[in-house]
């Protein structure tokens, strides 16, 4: 018997990746950073590969090394790399590394020297996000340094890449501007004498809506897990995560009873209350107080009062409810339960954050569709 659980449907991940892969001639990198967006990095990676993914993408060196320790041998790109990391371990493990500056390139050269083999690099150009990557004015210097390092046998420039700002808002002019900057940057790559095998720019949203941005490799993340990056569009994706818990306690209270800390909710009639053993330590946003949707007894209800560290309360009115009944916070929506999108709307965030929060806590994660 379980008290609370996050269930992950690995067949949904396989199906989503297969569908995404069929929509483009480009290779596909399934992004499994953030513990697979809360779905479990290694199980999600295996499922994505089953579905036809060619690459895996992560942020950190530790994430990439974990994939290698799990026996995964496909190309892996790691791109969020602070100074001073043991990058030679990544080079030895055959991990591709993202490079955003000349200083970072110098670290990669040293890592290759220590590892005794060239570091495989993807040079990143900042096309407008103002985050990682070399700006268009810095780009020639990075390209010249990379070309020299490659000529010296210290590195191999495998890819050139960037990241969109507004791809989740189809038609936004910034996307076209970024694409133009990327093309400008690619022209400079050629002039520097580099011939990288992979050019990549498309995240989930661009994979789904901008075939002109697919180039040689697409990098879907959220869509792998069945969630849409574009508001109001489902694209036929199948959500992979369900979060639920069993009612811990029920009680009858009179009209006018204050509920949870601060009594921010008061019953307007005699009511049956259900205490659910999930709280902000389990990924339930405290901002879901008096707003988070939950299905219990086939009825959508709203969290009553403040979310606590370990529990919250539902006002069930006259409806019968008993300890052990299942409360579903979100799932696919097929049976009328809330979705991660519903939760994101209720608390003023994005579906990415909802699944990542719920899937990366003390709540046990269980899997359907596991393969031997």
UniProtKB/Swiss-Prot annotation:
Enzyme type, top EC level: isomerase
Active site annotation, chain numbering: 33 (proton acceptor), 261 (proton acceptor)
Reactions catalysed according to its record: L-alanine = D-alanine
Modification sites for N6-(pyridoxal phosphate)lysine: 33
Keyword hit for Isomerase: yes
EC number: 5.1.1.1
Pfam families: Ala_racemase_C, Ala_racemase_N
GO biological process, one term: D-alanine biosynthetic process
Pathway listed: Amino-acid biosynthesis; D-alanine biosynthesis; D-alanine from L-alanine: step 1/1
Single GO cellular component term: cytosol
Alphabetized GO MF terms: alanine racemase activity; pyridoxal phosphate binding
Domain of life: Bacteria
Record SUPFAM superfamilies: Alanine racemase C-terminal domain-like, PLP-binding barrel
Residues involved in substrate binding: 131, 309
Protein function: Catalyzes the interconversion of L-alanine and D-alanine. May also act on other amino acids.
Entry similarity comment: Belongs to the alanine racemase family.
Descriptive protein name: Alanine racemase
Origin species: Salinispora tropica (strain ATCC BAA-916 / DSM 44818 / JCM 13857 / NBRC 105044 / CNB-440)
Gene: alr
